[in-house]
């Protein structure tokens, strides 16, 4: 054997940090030298474009070959494996993938289209088909691509490191559909678990964890939703859906994206919803996380099909006129060995200090928003879903956990910011910039924050000090009102303020009223399960509460199953209890939600000024003894008015007087006590005439709400 250099041994042992320095074509003392590493090959030749064939000598039994050609030229390798001879392109003859400008933007953390450069991209280089791989691992000693194309041999395709710690390699003949991972040696020479690609566009079905090459430029682009569908003056009624448990096959198997596309959008449209919000669809290893612990932020989960199939689902929603929102999780990630944690042998995506980098409640890792590469990665992910899949909005999960350094931490268990405060300044900057970029690139899209504290101006523009979200979930409204309706009616007069209090701050943000998945799990019971009394009272209570919600200022969100009054808590491992609709009580609730949605959409007074104080006036606030509330909703037109009267007691009230803003005849356009919904059919015979002093003399049905609008 020829005496080998340390570089040659580094190639053989799979630990060379810059294989292009040794492999490929090089000028050595005026000679054109070709070196190749092909384990299992018994013979290798270099075949030049000019027809020259140069034999390469085997200089090590591991598969290291070298030889000379007459001069620099394009070439390919002709290798013999057993009885088989094949021509191969040499990955180490190609120029870099990333440009200097790419590296400049990556170094600044300003590459808005990170998904065009990082990850795995089918491409043609120098006339050769293959896949370009790029990954961030600044502290790694060596990174290799392993996959179907090299028998998962880390010595076959070590990558080259570019500026700022980005590793890249073009692998000829790799193709869409190939499975792959990154094999990384850490800064101390330690061999890390194989890592999935943080930028992968698809991944294997759990429990397998390989990434899958996708030519995402060939993905079909879903048709757009109506451009004004997210605006503040439009009706926004959101159907929140967990794709794995909305409906299942007879064998309890999931519906695929395409099967969901055939059923879900048409159902949501028939029910009157304007939006569908999917619980996180990014790839995640644990079903029980519901998607809130993702490992593949750029990959729709393979549980239900391919990226193309997910496109079909989004397109089907848009075809029905529905906007699609995704739950987006930039707040934390799991520490599964194949994931982002300790990615290059150091805390790359997370904080090194567990007082900053580990979430105590969930056992997950927290992103280091102060690291430009990490913030760039997350912002780019937000833009990716909007551009590549035509998503119309992002609901950002667990914003409070991002904003506060001491979130769910004991005294002494957190690190203050540079001013000594508890605010996470880097997270604030990240959220603001994300919203600026989302609205800047996709003005028709929106964002919504699940923020459970009193942080100010969450849904106000960044230039006036806000966080820049389009909407904020009104968690306070949800907690107060559910607590109120959970009381026995005889005690509600002592809790009257829990209904009134929400209007003190109802217009401080652009609020969404959420009855979400979080309210029907972990022993909280279903929404119906929270209602007191016998069956009649429970269902009447629920009808009144839903009606109260749709009459209240704010956009609406209802988790799947709430619309059919599911009795049990939500279980992600099984379908909703659709069989309940065979019982008139449950079918009545479904009919109620359908009619409330259509009423909300068709009455401008109920949605045009959802987020403006000018769109609301109290009419009755002091009738605690009878558990009655009344208010008027107002649209832009002076006759766009809707009076809502809610009776949260089981009593019928006759001759109940309510002063209204306009004289004349008022039509009762909705009554939750209608027998159509399972009620007792007490009401106002369709219309009421206002007296000279603009008062209506009403019959208030028990545990019910009535909506009245002026005659045109």
Curated annotation (Swiss-Prot):
Keywords: Carbohydrate metabolism, Glycogen biosynthesis, Glycogen metabolism, Glycosyltransferase, Transferase
Metabolic or biological pathway, per its Swiss-Prot or TrEMBL entry: Glycan biosynthesis; glycogen biosynthesis
MF GO annotations: 1,4-alpha-glucan branching enzyme activity; cation binding; hydrolase activity, hydrolyzing O-glycosyl compounds
GN (gene name): glgB
Catalytic residues in the record: 397 (nucleophile), 450 (proton donor)
Domain of life: Bacteria
PANTHER family on file: 1,4-ALPHA-GLUCAN-BRANCHING ENZYME
Entry EC no(s): 2.4.1.18
Name of the protein this chain belongs to: 1,4-alpha-glucan branching enzyme GlgB
């Amino acid at each position: 054997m020829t005496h080998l250099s340390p570089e040659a041994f580094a190639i053989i042992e799979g630990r060379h940090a810059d294989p292009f320095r040794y492999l490929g074509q090089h000028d050595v003392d005026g000679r054109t030298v070709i070196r190749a590493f092909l384990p299992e090959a018994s013979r290798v030749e270099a075949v030049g474009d000019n027809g020259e064939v140069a034999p390469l000598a085997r200089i090590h039994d591991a598969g290291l070959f070298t030889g000379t050609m007459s001069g620099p030229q394009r070439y390919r390798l002709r290798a013999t494996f057993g009885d088989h001879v094949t021509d191969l392109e040499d990955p180490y003859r190609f120029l870099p993938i990333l440009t200097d400008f790419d590296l400049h933007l990556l170094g600044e953390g300003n590459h808005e289209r990170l998904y065009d450069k990082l990850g795995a991209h089918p491409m043609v280089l120098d006339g050769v088909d293959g896949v370009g791989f790029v990954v961030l691992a600044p502290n790694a000693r060596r990174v290799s691509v392993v996959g179907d194309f090299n028998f998962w041999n880390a010595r076959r395709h070590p990558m080259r490191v570019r500026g700022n710690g980005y590793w890249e390699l073009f692998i000829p003949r790799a193709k869409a559909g190939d499975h792959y991972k990154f094999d990384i040696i850490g800064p101390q020479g330690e061999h890390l678990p194989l890592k999935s690609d943080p930028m992968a566009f698809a991944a294997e079905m759990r429990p397998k964890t390989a990434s899958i090459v996708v030519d995402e430029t060939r993905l079909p682009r879903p048709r757009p939703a109506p451009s004004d569908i997210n605006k503040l003056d439009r009706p926004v009624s959101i159907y929140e859906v967990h794709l794995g448990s909305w409906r299942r096959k007879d064998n309890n198997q999931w519906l695929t994206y395409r099967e969901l596309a055939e059923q879900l959008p048409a159902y949501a449209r028939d029910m009157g919803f304007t939006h569908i919000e999917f619980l996180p669809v990014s790839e995640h290893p644990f079903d029980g996380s519901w998607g809130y612990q993702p490992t593949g932020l750029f990959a729709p989960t393979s549980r239900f099909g391919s990226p193309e199939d997910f496109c079909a689902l989004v397109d089907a929603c848009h075809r029905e006129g529905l906007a699609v929102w995704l739950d987006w999780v930039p707040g934390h990630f799991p520490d599964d060995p194949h994931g982002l944690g300790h990615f290059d042998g150091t805390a790359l995506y997370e904080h090194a200090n567990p007082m900053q980098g580990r979430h105590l409640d969930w056992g997950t890792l927290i992103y280091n928003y102060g690291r430009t590469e990490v913030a760039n990665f997350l912002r780019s992910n937000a833009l990716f879903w909007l551009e590549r899949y035509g998503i119309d909005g992002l609901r950002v999960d667990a914003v409070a956990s991002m904003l506060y350094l001491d979130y769910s931490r004991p005294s002494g268990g957190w690190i203050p910011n540079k001013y000594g405060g508890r605010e996470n300044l880097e997270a604030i900057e990240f959220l603001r910039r994300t919203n600026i970029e989302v609205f800047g690139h996709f003005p028709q899209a929106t964002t919504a924050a699940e923020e459970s504290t009193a942080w100010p101006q969450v849904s106000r523009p960044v230039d006036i000090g806000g966080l820049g979200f389009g909407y904020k979930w009104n968690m306070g409204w949800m907690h107060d009102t559910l607590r109120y309706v959970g009381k026995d009616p005889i005690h509600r007069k002592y809790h009257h303020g829990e209904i009134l209090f929400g209007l003190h701050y109802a217009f401080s943000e652009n609020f969404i009223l959420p009855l979400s998945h979080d309210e029907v799990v972990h022993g909280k019971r279903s929404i119906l399960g929270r209602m007191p009394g016998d069956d009649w009272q429970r269902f009447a209570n629920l009808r009144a509460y839903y009606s109260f919600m749709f009459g209240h200022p704010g956009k609406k969100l209802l988790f799947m199953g709430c619309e059919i009054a599911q009795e049990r808590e939500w279980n992600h491992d099984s379908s909703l209890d659709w069989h309940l609709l065979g019982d008139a009580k449950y079918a009545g609730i479904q009919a109620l939600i359908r009619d409330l949605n259509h009423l909300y959409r068709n009455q401008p007074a109920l949605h045009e000024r959802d987020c403006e104080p000018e769109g609301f006036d109290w009419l009755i606030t002091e009738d605690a003894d009878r558990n009655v509330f009344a208010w008027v909703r107002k649209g832009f037109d002076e006759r766009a008015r809707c009076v809502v009267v809610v009776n949260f007691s089981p009593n019928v009230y006759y001759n109940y007087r309510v002063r209204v803003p306009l004289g004349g005849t008022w039509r009762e356009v909705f009554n939750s006590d209608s027998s159509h919904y399972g009620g007792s059919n007490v009401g106002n015979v369709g219309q009421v005439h206002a007296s000279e002093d603009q008062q209506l003399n009403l019959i208030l049905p028990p545990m019910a709400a009535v909506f009245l609008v002026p005659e045109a």
